[in-house]
From Swiss-Prot:
Residues 24-41 have a biased composition (Basic and acidic residues). This is Deoxyguanosinetriphosphate triphosphohydrolase-like protein. It comes from Haemophilus influenzae (strain PittGG). HAMAP family: dGTPase_type2. Keywords: Hydrolase. GO terms for biological process: dGTP catabolic process. Residues 72-285 form the HD domain. Pfam families: HD, HD_assoc. Residues 22-41 are annotated as: Disordered. SUPFAM superfamilies: HD-domain/PDEase-like. One of its GO terms (molecular function) is dGTPase activity. NCBIfam families: antiphage_dGTPase, dGTP_triPase, PRK05318.1. Gene3D superfamilies: Hypothetical protein af1432.
Amino acid sequence: MQKNEIKQIDMKPLIIDSSWTERFLPDPPREKDNRPPFRRDRGRILHSAAFRCLQAKTQIHSIGENDFYRTRLTHSLEVAQIGSSLVAQLKFLETFESLSQTLNIDKNELQKQLKPLLPSNDLIESLCFAHDIGHPPFGHGGETALNYMMAEQGGFEGNAQTFRILTKLEPYTENAGMNLTRRTLLGVVKYPALLDVASPQYAELNFSRNIDARFVRIHDWIPGKGIFRDDLKMFNWLLENLSENDRTLFCQFKKVRENPAESLHTRFKSLDCSIMELADDIAYGVHDLEDAIVTGMVNPHQWQAAHSALKQIPSAWLHENIDSISQRLFSDKHFERKQAIGALVNFFITNVRWKLTANFDEPLLRYNAELSPEVIVALGVFKKFVWDYVIRNVDTQRIEYKGQRMLTEMFQIFESDPERLLPRNTANRWRNAPEERKKRIICDYIAGMSDAHALRVYQQL
């Protein structure tokens, strides 16, 4: 934001509105249950079937190829640890320095005002535990395959499925999912827009739809980011305590679509979500690099370009440490590599700071966490290296292709005779659903499978 766009900041201590602890359904604690609301949310997520299923879902590599690889479950646990560390760091005075200069307000005053906004450990861990539970089997390949099959019924995307599981599918209640607090749900919404609006406009593109899943140009069907239109009722409830101005601003896209093949991305997210997303990015960039090194997917020669890029970044810490970090990353001594990984994670965590987003009335939207510009560039180098040498690795891509082919074929088979081939409960839901939502029932069933379960079902068919 420009300084001339900033409205006057009221320096009274901020108090979180009680509506953020409301649930969609009345849900008083059980007798003698004195847990605060976000601890109850954490327990529901931690004990859910959707969370347990993460132990058998791919982070990047196929489950069973190597026991060292992280699954989405171990990844989520590490994201929670980093998220809690970021929250602790954001309490320190130094993290208010940049915001103090932006607002021309003493950083001590900002610290007093804004610290109460920070999520509790229960809340940030809830978000980090939940952030990946909507991802289907076989990672982004599975996600794109399901989007291809659902393109005419609102599409499919992992973050949208996460919101759907939390608010509808997980059987803690009959029709409201886990019935989590409003603030927890706000924290998992990375992209506050409808998926069928944010995604490429497939009806205008006329992409070929090959009935044989082996020959689908799957790259054409990468989804945008958002919420399913089927879940609009819960999304509207989530935002109903915001002012009209805040709702409109919160759901804005970064730009206007220039061609139908373009995906649109929203501009804003909540404070809690920004912390969770930073934790996810740090875990992705650093821990997935560790997986790749340990299992021999990458070597020091491939790392040289990234090493050179990191040395060009105007960071005193990187200039002083990146040579030894790079050497220790590829050391034969496991403890040296572990020390290097720990040093990198600490570098990113200790460079977090407060940021003003826009003139929101709601303080949970007005402020975000961010990394300083040079540290953002550094994290981007790590993420790009993982993308280039791990995700785009031919073995990874073949596993992903195999997975997307299996999911596409399974979807077609289930759709051809659902009452015969779907499990009884799923078949009953399919039978009772209106015509326009029947495919969503099949999609929910497939998306909820682990990699191993999907493989077993495919082999049965």
